[in-house]
């Protein structure tokens, strides 16, 4: 695929995920002959991505002023020239700041402006466009201070100045996640576009929306509160011990259940056109619910709508949120006056609640209200499913119970969100009875009863050395190859390969030998004909770079890669086809480079807006997170015919990595119910729908146990319940006892600095040899899915 085609897709996908939050007085789209004045440093030096491993070193991004000028919009020249001159003279280390792990930044100093220049721009322009930007990322959470979560003094002054001087104003939010917007309650702007971090085509995609070449169609995949204190997570974020006291009430589940009015609701987003969603039918087939609707474009622009389906479950033994997202679909482009029929489907058993008392998923008796609309705060009742008795859908094992005092909030005294006519809609709704006999019970046996078996060399094979070529030819099994390996070879294979000379300065990007700038690679062996697998960071493309101080020169190949939109943009698009296409484009870049594994996508829940890596992740909702990850995985691992491509994704970070500062030593205290229904659910969806070939664990602990060495998480749930059949790897330089990695089900220690501890443990018997052999088998099975498939 030619690069121009990938950048064209990146531009389209970026525009599809930018949310129009406000559009008063018909300011947008801009007139074809509009004259605009651009304010804010990101208007001239846009943040295309966040910092850390999620950053990209591709071509310089298209700037906002460039995109507008190429679209035929007149950008005030004197203001532009002043801004570009000052920016160039004061760029300092901004051009390499995200390459040095100790120089992360959230904000760029603003451009000083003479009031006379602003007056001139106001007299000669029709519209003022102000861009507010924020950069955050790995090891770089936002902070509750000015210039981070809050606007800086310079930004506040600029807001007031633009508001006072211009009659028509547009605000662009070039941010990875929510920042405080309370100043705009007083100093109002006519239009607000949440551009997020959109990759290298940022300026062109923004111009496409501002000029109306593309009609906005994105919706919020996370709730934005009016103030930070409105989130239930504000008192428990980023500490050494973090109690997830909100339980299942995350994001809109909290705001709706406790009736806290958000600034921008989950699922909200405006368009230049308008739509009518008419519910036409609801059906029940076994446990599957189908809701049919007709979407009509009632406005004057061609556009796309996102139809969302929510479920309100009855309370019983367990409290339930006011509603949960259970299905969604994005229409095709609908012309004015035209319609499209859609069907939203979901299986009611997928939304059973976890009862910790007996480690079971249950559907409780009562009425399940089905709602359809275009945001969480704009739905109508489509019907109801009734269940006469409690039914257990899954019998599991207690795996991740809290082992200390832990209290969660309750909705007992809360009054939930409602809307005019809701009670009447529920009373008049079509009711469909679910027969308990139609609900199948799934029982998971304890995985502890089936431990790995020690592999030994058969007598007839003692004079034969089997290789991976023999496995490929059908002359041997992977197990026969691994059975031959001595302790050193086993310890080598379960560690990433750090080439000679890099051990003492093993920075990200310096450890791979196969592809310079890659994040790491697996061990290779001529003896067993086993090639190395190289992996590179994501999730917005392939990042090839070396972190350090001083910053090293980029590799030539790094700039050939496309910087695609961030995970948040992809989620805001609610477009699964775009997710699949993004995966296919990334796969093409992997092929160019010789990279087999992509360390992406990331699908941790956006629990709190301060998390620096929110831009990498998809949503506060596990359904959106899981489905986005699944479709990206489809695009990477499968071609259009469903055949394996020889490339793979590594979904990450399992699990509850919801703060990036102090991430290696924090303990997330979470009820097993909240874990299973919120923080693990997206991973479960991605695994069950797409079977990614690899998965990465997170740095943090859950309930006192590091995720990287947690048997219950990696073997009991991931493999025992979800059926994951791929390889698990650690994050780079994680904590956790080396003797526990493979026993827990963590196969590959990255970047590879635990070889000696594991070798000693093998030789002393402190580690189960059969578990290490099993991990090597999984690694070789991954190699068979990649290198040999490509050949």
What are these regions (language model features)?
Residues 378-395:
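Short beta-strand elements
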Residues 1-354, 360-372, 376-378, 398-791:
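Glycoside hydrolase catalytic-domain context in secreted enzymes
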């Amino acid at each position: 695929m030619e690069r121009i085609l990938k950048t064209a897709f990146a531009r389209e996908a970026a525009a599809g995920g930018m949310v129009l939050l406000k559009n008063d007085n018909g300011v947008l789209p801009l007139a074809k002959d509009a004259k605009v004045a651009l304010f804010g440093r990101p208007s001239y030096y846009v943040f295309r991505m966040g910092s850390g491993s999620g950053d990209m070193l591709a071509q310089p991004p298209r700037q906002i002023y460039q995109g507008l000028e190429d679209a035929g919009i007149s950008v005030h020249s004197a203001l532009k020239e002043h801004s570009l001159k000052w920016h160039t003279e004061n760029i300092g280390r901004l051009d390499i700041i995200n390459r040095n792990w100790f120089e992360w930044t959230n904000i760029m100093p603003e451009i000083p402006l003479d009031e006379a220049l602003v007056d001139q721009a106001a007299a000669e322009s029709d519209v003022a466009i102000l861009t507010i930007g924020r950069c955050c990322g790995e090891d770089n959470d936002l902070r509750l201070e000015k210039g981070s979560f809050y606007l800086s003094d310079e930004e506040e002054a600029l807001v007031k100045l633009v508001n006072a001087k211009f009659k028509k104003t547009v605000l662009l939010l070039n941010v990875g996640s929510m920042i405080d917007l309370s100043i705009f309650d007083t100093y109002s702007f006519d239009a607000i576009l949440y551009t997020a971090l959109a990759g290298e085509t940022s300026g062109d995609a923004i111009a496409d929306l501002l000029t109306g070449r593309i009609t906005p169609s994105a919706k919020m995949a996370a709730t934005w509160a009016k103030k930070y204190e409105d989130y239930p997570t504000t008192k428990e974020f980023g500490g050494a011990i973090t109690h997830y006291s909100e339980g299942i009430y995350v994001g809109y589940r909290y705001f709706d259940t406790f009736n806290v009015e958000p600034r921008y609701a989950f699922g909200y987003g405006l368009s230049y056109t308008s739509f009518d969603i008419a519910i036409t039918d609801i059906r029940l087939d076994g446990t599957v619910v189908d809701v049919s609707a007709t979407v009509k474009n009632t406005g004057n622009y061609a556009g796309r709508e996102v139809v969302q389906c929510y479920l309100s479950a009855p309370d019983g033994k367990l409290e339930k949120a006011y509603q949960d997202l259970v299905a969604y679909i994005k229409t095709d482009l609908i012309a004015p006056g035209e319609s499209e029929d859609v069907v939203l489907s979901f299986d009611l058993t997928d939304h059973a609640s976890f009862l910790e008392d007996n480690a079971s998923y249950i559907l409780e008796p009562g009425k399940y209200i089905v709602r359809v609309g275009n945001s969480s705060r704009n739905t109508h009742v489509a019907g109801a499913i009734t269940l006469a008795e409690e039914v257990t859908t899954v019998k599991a094992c207690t795996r991740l119970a809290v082992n200390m005092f832990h209290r969660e909030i309750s909705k007992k005294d809360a009054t939930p969100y409602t809307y005019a006519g809701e009670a009447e809609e529920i009373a008049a709704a079509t009711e469909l009875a679910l027969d308990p006999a139609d609900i199948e019970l799934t029982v998971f046996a304890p995985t502890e009863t089936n431990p790995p078996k020690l592999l030994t060399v058969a007598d007839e094979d003692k004079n034969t050395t089997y290789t991976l070529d023999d496995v490929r030819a059908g002359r041997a099994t992977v197990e026969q190859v691994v059975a031959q390996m001595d302790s050193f070879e086993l310890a080598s294979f379960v560690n990433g390969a750090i080439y000679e000379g890099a051990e003492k300065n093993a920075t990200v990007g310096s450890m791979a030998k196969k592809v310079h700038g890659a994040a790491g690679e697996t061990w290779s062996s001529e003896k067993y004909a086993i090639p190395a697998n190289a992996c590179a960071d994501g999730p917005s493309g392939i990042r090839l770079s070396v972190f350090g101080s001083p910053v090293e020169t980029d590799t030539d190949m790094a700039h050939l890669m496309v910087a695609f939109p961030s995970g948040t943009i992809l989620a805001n698009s609610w477009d699964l086809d775009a997710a699949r296409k993004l995966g296919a484009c990334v796969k093409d870049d992997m092929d160019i480079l010789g990279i087999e594994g992509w360390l992406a996508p990331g699908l941790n829940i956006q629990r709190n807006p301060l998390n620096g890596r929110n831009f990498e992740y998809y949503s506060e909702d596990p359904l959106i997170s899981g489905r986005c990850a699944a479709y990206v995985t489809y695009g990477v691992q499968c071609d259009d015919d469903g055949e394996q491509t020889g490339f793979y994704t590594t979904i990450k970070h399992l699990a509850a990595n919801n703060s990036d500062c102090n991430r290696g030593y924090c303990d997330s205290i979470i009820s097993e119910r909240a874990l299973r229904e919120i923080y693990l659910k997206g991973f479960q969806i991605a695994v069950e729908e797409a079977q990614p070939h690899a998965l990465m664990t997170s740095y943090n602990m859950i309930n006192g146990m590091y995720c990287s060495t947690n048997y219950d998480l990696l073997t009991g749930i991931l493999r025992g319940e979800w059926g994951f059949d791929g390889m698990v790897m650690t994050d780079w330089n994680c904590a956790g006892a080396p003797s526990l990695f493979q026993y827990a089900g963590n196969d590959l220690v990255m970047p590879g600095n635990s070889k000696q501890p594991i070798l000693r443990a093998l030789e002393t018997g402190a580690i189960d040899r059969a578990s290490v052999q099993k991990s090597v088998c999984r690694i070789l099975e991954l190699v068979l899915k990649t290198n040999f498939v490509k050949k």
